[in-house]
């Protein structure tokens, strides 16, 4: 199987952490769309949003998704990538989409433990726990709609990777 694997889910679900280790275990290339975009523009996500607002960032995010999609690649996407209908169809039609699902409490704890998350612009201007709750309520149905595989991401990364590999084996052998 050489199809790209798209990891989707909210901030803090482990897309980058799991993605790097999953790519290594599958002997694949790893790309994070936010990191790729930041390196191309030499700007942080917050700087891009400040300069181009969210609409401009979302357009660049779509271009990044198309640019990094390649065979034998694990792609960690931005949490809002599913907000654009084109992106949802693109991922569904060009690879296997894995939703890393976790409850609000886990996401908030992870985000509070990661100081680099302070570099991310707020989506709602609300306190973190309220923002995560609101954003997840808005996006969960979209994550589920686009996903070929849904994985409980509350476990340790090694367990999440094992579950993804098992689900991939079942998907391929159907």
Curated annotation (Swiss-Prot):
Binding annotation for substrate: 34, 58, 79, 139
UniProt-listed GO biological process terms: amino acid biosynthetic process; aromatic amino acid family biosynthetic process; chorismate biosynthetic process
Pfam families cross-referenced by the UniProt entry: SKI (PF01202)
Signal peptide stretch: none
Coiled coil keyword on record: no
Chain positions covered by the region annotation LID domain: 112-126
Compartment list: Cytoplasm
Any one GO molecular-function label of the UniProt entry: magnesium ion binding
Binding annotation for Mg(2+): 16, 32
Pathway: Metabolic intermediate biosynthesis; chorismate biosynthesis; chorismate from D-erythrose 4-phosphate and phosphoenolpyruvate: step 5/7
Entry-linked PROSITE patterns: SHIKIMATE_KINASE
Required cofactor(s): Mg(2+)
InterPro entries hit by this protein: P-loop_NTPase (IPR027417), Shikimate/glucono_kinase (IPR031322), Shikimate_kinase/TSH1 (IPR000623), Shikimate_kinase_2 (IPR027544), Shikimate_kinase_CS (IPR023000)
Keywords: Amino-acid biosynthesis, Aromatic amino acid biosynthesis, ATP-binding, Cytoplasm, Kinase, Magnesium, Metal-binding, Nucleotide-binding, Transferase
Catalytic activity: shikimate + ATP = 3-phosphoshikimate + ADP + H(+)
Cofactor: how bound: Binds 1 Mg(2+) ion per subunit.
One cellular component term from this protein's GO annotations in UniProt: cytosol
PANTHER family referenced in this protein's UniProt entry, alphabetically: SHIKIMATE KINASE, SHIKIMATE KINASE 2
Recorded family membership: Belongs to the shikimate kinase family. AroL subfamily.
Function statement: Catalyzes the specific phosphorylation of the 3-hydroxyl group of shikimic acid using ATP as a cosubstrate.
Domain notes for this protein: The LID domain closes over the active site upon ATP binding.
Subunit structure: Monomer.
Name assigned to this protein: Shikimate kinase 2
């Amino acid at each position: 199987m050489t199809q790209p694997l798209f990891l989707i889910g909210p901030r803090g679900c482990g897309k980058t952490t799991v993605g790097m280790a999953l790519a290594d275990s599958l002997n694949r290339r790893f790309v994070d769309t936010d990191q790729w975009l930041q390196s191309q523009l030499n700007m942080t996500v917050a700087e891009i949003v400040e300069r181009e607002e969210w609409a401009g960032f979302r357009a660049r995010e779509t271009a990044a998704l198309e640019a990094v999609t390649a065979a034998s690649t694990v792609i960690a996407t931005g949490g809002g990538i599913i907000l654009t209908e084109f992106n949802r169809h693109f991922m569904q039609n060009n690879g296997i989409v894995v939703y890393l699902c976790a409850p609000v409490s886990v996401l908030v704890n992870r985000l509070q433990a990661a100081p680099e998350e302070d570099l991310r612009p707020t989506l709602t201007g609300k306190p973190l726990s309220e923002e995560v709750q609101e954003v997840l309520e808005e996006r969960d149905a979209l994550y589920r709609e686009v996903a070929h595989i849904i994985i409980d991401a509350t476990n340790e990364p090694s367990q999440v990777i094992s579950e993804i590999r098992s689900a991939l084996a079942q998907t391929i052998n159907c």
